[in-house]
Structure formats: structure tokens, C-alpha cells
């Protein structure tokens, strides 16, 4: 029976490593950094090992069936063995393809929750309005995935928003939302346009994986923390108390602020989350700037300046330029039905990883 022996041996070794990690985890009590690292590694390997368990059973079953078929002393079992062998041969190729994908290097941030920042770019009022439209899209998308949105900062204008930041909490959020980083272009006729001309405007979206304090260490001495009165809707409470918090990381000049929480403590916690994510982003940018152009051209590079998508309202079409994919269902897309596009982007990302491995 044919099967990928090299891959099988690799997976046996991965399973053995996971078993060792589980044993180590049982003996750990106070080393929280190590506990965190082990749990993260085991979570990343969970799906791979689940598929391998089925694959392993089929390989063992197929090999045993072959032995029975080749043993004339066991002729009475040949018919059953042939059925087992045929079942193994039928399922093994598909499982091997799944395992090849699962063996690709995982993005270490895929299982993380995220912080999203949205800003108008070119296009004046239309750009500000589209920031609000995209926020509504993400609210619907999060609802479909049972993710929770928590607004960090929301700065309204007369027609839209000059800035919105929010966190998304749930399972494997970054693995899907990371593809939303970049410049989003909208083409439509503004409500104020008397001659019916189509205007083009853009907004920028940044998606940052939330970083644990275990992963991003910050020296408290490097921080300046300011409090101020929150602006915007909120009644008398907004005007009386300095609940908004702004944290500046002095060595880098990076600033994170939050004013939407119910208390100064809650806003400070959220601002620290944002700061950790922004420091991670700055470190990643520095690292990636040193890499070849190959990585920069990859899907999901997260470059804020990359024009990734066009929303054409007159033609009810949305186009993702990274994969040259168009959907003639912009109306449904704007209601949060974006998984078809996201799944295509994830598949492209996996293809690129596979190509890199093949070329090494």
C-alpha cells in the first residue's frame, strides 16, 4: 500500500513531542511563561494531531490488511481485508493533502484576538462615511462568528467618523481578520452629488494581534500616563470625570489611548493592550523591512499602504486585488458575508507557503 512514509515519520515525531509537552505541563505549577508557551504550542498542533490520528489508523489498518491478503493461511479473512485495504487507499490521499496544509508553518498570531483601527484617507466626507459602513460590516461579521466587539475609541464627524478603534475577542480572530489590513477603496455616488457622478474615496484599516504581557514586556519607567475628560456621547459623566487614558511609550513615542470604557481603570487596561500591539507592530515592521521583497508581496503582509480591495457600488461588485477575485454581491458583502473572500485569501496564503517550502 502506498503512503507518504516521510510525512508519516514526521508526524509520529510531532505526536511524541506533544506527549512530552503534556507530561511537562502536568509537572509545572509556577512557571507561567513556560505554561503559556506549552499551551500555545499544543493548541497550534491540535488539529494536525486530530487528522493524523485518523490517518494513522488507516495506514495501520491498510498495512495489516495487506499482510492478511498475502497470507494464504488466512484466506477466510481475505474478503474483509480487501474491504479494509480499499477503504484505506480511498481515504489516505485526501488526508495526506490535508496534513500537508496543516504541516505548513503556522502564523504564531493566528489564534490571537485583535485590535482594529480605521481612518478615513482620501475623499473627504465620503471617506468618513465609509469608515462607519465598514465598522457596521465588521459588527455583522463578528456576530456571525460569535466574536465580541469592544469599542476603544470612536470619533464622530458631522456625517461619519474620523477614527474608530475596537477590539475583537473570540477564537482565532487574527487568522481571518489579518487580511483586512490595508487601503480599502470605495466607488459610489454620494448622496450630495446632484449630477450622479461616481466618486472614489479610500480608508485605511490596521489589524493588530493582541499581545500578552508575557510576550511583550514593557518597563513601567518607560511610560507616561495622562488622563483627560472623554469627549463625545456619554451624558454628564463625560464632562465631570477624567476617565479617558493616554499612554505614551517614551523610547519609541508610540501612543495608545482609550476613552470608551466605563472607568479609568478599564480604559487604562485597554490602552495597555493597544500599546503592546503597537509595539509588536513596530518591531515586526523593523524586522520585515530587512527581508526580501518576496515576503512583502505575500498575501496578508498587513502593509497599511497596500491597496487591497475596491467596493464598486454602481456595479454591486467587490474586488480583492491581491488575488484578483471579484464577487457580484457587494450588498451581501456589506452585511458581513465576507467568508468566501477570506477563505480564498487563506487558501492563497497556504499556496504561497507551500511554494516557499518547495523552493527551499
From Swiss-Prot:
SMART domains in the record: PCRF
Alphabetical list of Gene3D superfamilies matching this protein: 3.30.160.20, 3.30.70.1660, 6.10.140.1950
Keywords: Cytoplasm, Methylation, Protein biosynthesis
Modified-residue entries (N5-methylglutamine), positions: 236
GO molecular function, one term: translation release factor activity, codon specific
A matching Pfam family: RF-1
Localization in the cell: Cytoplasm
Gene Ontology CC: cytoplasm
UniProt PTM comment: Methylated by PrmC. Methylation increases the termination efficiency of RF1.
Record-stated family: Belongs to the prokaryotic/mitochondrial release factor family.
Function summary: Peptide chain release factor 1 directs the termination of translation in response to the peptide chain termination codons UAG and UAA.
Protein name: Peptide chain release factor 1
Species of the source: Mycoplasmoides gallisepticum (strain R(low / passage 15 / clone 2)) (Mycoplasma gallisepticum)
Lineage of the organism: Bacteria, Bacillati, Mycoplasmatota, Mycoplasmoidales, Mycoplasmoidaceae
Encoding gene (name): prfA
Amino acid at each position: 500500500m502506498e503512503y507518504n512514509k516521510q510525512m508519516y515519520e514526521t508526524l509520529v515525531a510531532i505526536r511524541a513531542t506533544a506527549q512530552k509537552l503534556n507530561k511537562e505541563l502536568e509537572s509545572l505549577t509556577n512557571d507561567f511563561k513556560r505554561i503559556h508557551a506549552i499551551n500555545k504550542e499544543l493548541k497550534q498542533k491540535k488539529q494536525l494531531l486530530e487528522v493524523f490520528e485518523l490517518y494513522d489508523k488507516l495506514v495501520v489498518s491498510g498495512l495489516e490488511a495487506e499482510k492478511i491478503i498475502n497470507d494464504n493461511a488466512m484466506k477466510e479473512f481475505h474478503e474483509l481485508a480487501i474491504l479494509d485495504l480499499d477503504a484505506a487507499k480511498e481515504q489516505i490521499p485526501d488526508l495526506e493533502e490535508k496534513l500537508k496544509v496543516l504541516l505548513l508553518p503556522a502564523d504564531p498570531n493566528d489564534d490571537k484576538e485583535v485590535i482594529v483601527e480605521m481612518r478615513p484617507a482620501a475623499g473627504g466626507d465620503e471617506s468618513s462615511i465609509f469608515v462607519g459602513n465598514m465598522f457596521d460590516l465588521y459588527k455583522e461579521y463578528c456576530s456571525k462568528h460569535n466574536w465580541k466587539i469592544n469599542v476603544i475609541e470612536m470619533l464622530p464627524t458631522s456625517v461619519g467618523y474620523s477614527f474608530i478603534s475596537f477590539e475583537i475577542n473570540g477564537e482565532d480572530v487574527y487568522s481571518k481578520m489579518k487580511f483586512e489590513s490595508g487601503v480599502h477603496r470605495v466607488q459610489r455616488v454620494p448622496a450630495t452629488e446632484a449630477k450622479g457622478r461616481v466618486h472614489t474615496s479610500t480608508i485605511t484599516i490596521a489589524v493588530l494581534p493582541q499581545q500578552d504581557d508575557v510576550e511583550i514586556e514593557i518597563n513601567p519607567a518607560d511610560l507616561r500616563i495622562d488622563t483627560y475628560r472623554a469627549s463625545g456621547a456619554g451624558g454628564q459623566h463625560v464632562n465631570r470625570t477624567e476617565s479617558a487614558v493616554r499612554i505614551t511609550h517614551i523610547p519609541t513615542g508610540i501612543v495608545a489611548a482609550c476613552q470608551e470604557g466605563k472607568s479609568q481603570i478599564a480604559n487604562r487596561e485597554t490602552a495597555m493592550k493597544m500599546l503592546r500591539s503597537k509595539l509588536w507592530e513596530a518591531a515586526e515592521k523593523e524586522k520585515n523591512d530587512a527581508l526580501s521583497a518576496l515576503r512583502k508581496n505575500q498575501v496578508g503582509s498587513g502593509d497599511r499602504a497596500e491597496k487591497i480591495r475596491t467596493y464598486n457600488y454602481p456595479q454591486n461588485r467587490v474586488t480583492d486585488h491581491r488575488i484578483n477575485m471579484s464577487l457580484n454581491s457587494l450588498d451581501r458583502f456589506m452585511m458581513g458575508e465576507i467568508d468566501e473572500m477570506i477563505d480564498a485569501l487563506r487558501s492563497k496564503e497556504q499556496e504561497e507557503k507551500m511554494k516557499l517550502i518547495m523552493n527551499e
